[in-house]
């Protein structure tokens, strides 16, 4: 019996009357009964693995299933390594922020953007500022003017609850 925990059918689990059988090195056994294909696999000391159940007739391959599963897991790990993790850095501002403080925060934002990180600017609205969220949008527009040379606006300044948020992403680097 099989020891697999995924959905791949092996050996006796394959219950189709006829299957197209392929060998490990590309040998073609043609269309044979599944019991005959299983016997060929057992004679070779390998497993019969169903690789295309939707085909007419279904396609089975004679191979070492342990080795096959190891290679599949290895491919998945490689694909996972190549996936790019998007990191979002958050910079908090207030409506009454001084221009020098804005410049300081923008300097940090530019460093993050140069490291290919996304940056979310957040203006916190306190008390009566909640009734006038447009002032927070204006602060973010001032910030945008300072970073637009190296960034692309991913999300426009928009009030969301007690905050006004804007997200910027780095401009794609030009390949020379």
Curated annotation (Swiss-Prot):
Primary location: cytoplasm
Name the record gives this protein: Translation initiation factor IF-3
An MF annotation (GO) of this entry: ribosome binding
SUPFAM superfamilies xref list: Translation initiation factor IF3, C-terminal domain (SSF55200), Translation initiation factor IF3, N-terminal domain (SSF54364)
Sorted UniProt keywords: Cytoplasm, Initiation factor, Protein biosynthesis
Subunit structure: Monomer.
UniProt-annotated location(s): Cytoplasm
Purpose: IF-3 binds to the 30S ribosomal subunit and shifts the equilibrium between 70S ribosomes and their 50S and 30S subunits in favor of the free subunits, thus enhancing the availability of 30S subunits on which protein synthesis initiation begins.
Entries under PANTHER family matching the protein: TRANSLATION INITIATION FACTOR IF-3 (PTHR10938), TRANSLATION INITIATION FACTOR IF-3, MITOCHONDRIAL (PTHR10938:SF0)
Gene3D superfamilies: Translation initiation factor 3 (IF-3), C-terminal domain (3.30.110.10), Translation initiation factor 3 (IF-3), N-terminal domain (3.10.20.80)
Superkingdom of this protein's organism: Bacteria
One Pfam family recorded for the sequence: IF3_N
Family under the similarity heading: Belongs to the IF-3 family.
One biological process term in Gene Ontology: ribosome disassembly
Source organism of this protein record: Wolinella succinogenes (strain ATCC 29543 / DSM 1740 / CCUG 13145 / JCM 31913 / LMG 7466 / NCTC 11488 / FDC 602W)
Annotated Gene Ontology cellular component terms: cytosol; membrane
